[in-house]
Amino acid sequence: MVFGMNLGNRRKATRVPDLSRYDYHYNGSGGNSVNQGDNYLKSHELSADAAFAASARAGSLVNYPERGYTNISRANSLRMGHPGQQQQQSSYIPRSYSFTARGAYAPRTGNVGNRRSVSAIPRTGTASSRGVGSRTGSMTGSVARVGSRTGSFAGGGNGSIIIKTQEVKDMMGRTQSITTQTIRRINGMEYVETTTQTAGLVEDPQFHFQQFAENDEFPISDELSATPPAAPLSESQPRTNQRLANFNSNAINNSAANNIRSDSEEEGEEHFTDASDVVEESGAFAEDDQDHFLAKVNKVDVDNNSKSYTSRKPLVQKQGVQQQQEVQHQGISQVQNTEAKSVGRKSTMSKRMTLRDTPNAQLEPEKDTTDQATPDNNATKRKSIFKSKKRNEAVAVPTVPTSDQKTLSQEEMYAIALEIAQQKYGHPTKTVSHSTDNGSRNEMTPILEDADVEQPHVLPTTLHLPTREEQIQHEQLQQPTAAIPTNEKSRHPKKKVKSILDRVVQFSQENSGNQPPKQHRGKQYSQQPPDVAPSNGTTDNFDTNASGHNINHNNNNHNNNNNTSSSSSLRHESGANPVVVTEDTTVLAASTAATPVDVNEPGNPDHVIPASSPSIDNTPRINEKTKSKKKNEKGSFFKRLFKSNKTHINTK
């Protein structure tokens, strides 16, 4: 504790400033009060020179005028001055020091000057007793620059007058205020008079922050604060002034901002002169443009949109009506031409099936033997549908006129189906004409060798060997997938070719009667299973097992087993119709040249029918019961066709 107290005492002793070394400037030795006057006389020369140098160094300051200033405030004070209190007495300005001129140097101190130094008022008893006046300049340490000018007038006796002027400037160098302080010493008393003059209006500190917060829209408003007010505004502009009053607290700034805003609004209205006329005609808004400016713009937009809609509406309606008429026309033609479209569907289902290439010259006999009831333009349309070999392109279905639909018979439809299949793949069969027609063939029985349906092709009751052309033709159409010795080599698989021709023959046999409407076919699709083979009391029944060899013929109660490698075999009985037997599977054998199938003459080697040669019924056996059953079985043909194709694909 003692050690700490001793340290504290030592610190206090060192912190006390020792001003004794400055006493020789004022009091000489500074220690003896008796010799104080003599010692002071020894050092007055140095102090006078220092004061003069300080006043001469600040002579470049500009004297500012003192006119035209308002808000003058004065303060008077009376103080007593005692000798020996220079360092202990504090003036009204902190950090003040005094310099006093004495003796012979009194006339020199009468000059007026400015200096930049921290100075105070000289207060010494000796100066007042000797009647010496001093004149110095001062400057206080503040945020802004302060220039001061002090004038002293020496009087007789104990009287002296000291005048000090302070000038405050801002950072831009503009004068903000001028303070004049007059000190009179009369009989040891000091009279202090202070006068302050301001250069202009003092800005509100709150408004200083408003220019950064609310008045960002008009950055030049601060510079326009000293400008005179603008001309009086019109009657419509005071309302805008009220709207902008919340942004500015100064009336001058508000007027300048309103002038800028009004000019921008007038420029904007020039673009909407035509719009304002429209709104005035409607009578929905007042005549004041600035109050309803935004409402006008919105109203004009709505009117323009409505006008554009009304002008474009008739065009849209016309186009819509035309499109609806076209759609309705197409819909009516599609409903009325269901048979023609079904033919098109049949052709698209067999896109993956190809036929062997044959000469294109074989197409020419078809033109001469086409049905006369069907117009030529329809036939050409049907031919042109499938000329393109691009499978990706959509095939347009021709629309048959309503007047020709009544003449389109079932026979024509089958002919079209065969013709489409031939034209699609470019492999038509050669036309073989026969003059023998005893009238025993059914009308609806198709002829595979003849593309013309109207030309009959009938085998005689006495079987004979087919011609070379027929044999070559049918071998081209039905070649097995394996390499079987034949007259001509096959380049395409047999199963796909066989499926087309077999289904056409079966379809012709099943659908010899009238076709039911299309809606009944859909019902029969679900009623008739696809696996059921057509069977009745008077027609042929085909029952093909898994291997495709056992065929049951129920016409005259004959049961025969026919194991061949061909896809079609002919079995003929005396007094009965030859039957075309279709098989879905193929059995490879060493030789398929011919197969004897004559039941009445089993040992006759002359009567041999080629395995690939189809035969057609000679006599019609169709009654009412047969027609009704064949109508029901007609719809399941395509299902069986698709299923048989899948079977071929699975058996590969």
UniProtKB/Swiss-Prot annotation:
Compartmental location: Cell membrane
GO biological process: DNA recombination; meiotic cell cycle
Chain residue ranges for the region called Disordered: 123-151, 304-406, 470-576, 594-652
UniProt biased composition (Low complexity): 316-336, 545-569
Comp. bias intervals (Basic residues): 380-390, 640-652
Keyword Nucleus: no
Any one of the GO CC terms: plasma membrane
Topological type in the membrane: Peripheral membrane protein
Keyword Cell membrane: yes
Keywords noted in UniProt: Cell membrane, DNA recombination, Meiosis, Membrane
Biased composition (Polar residues): 125-141, 337-361, 506-517, 524-544, 612-621
UniProt name for this protein: Meiotic sister-chromatid recombination protein 3
Annotated source species: Kluyveromyces lactis (strain ATCC 8585 / CBS 2359 / DSM 70799 / NBRC 1267 / NRRL Y-1140 / WM37) (Yeast)
Gene responsible for this protein: MSC3
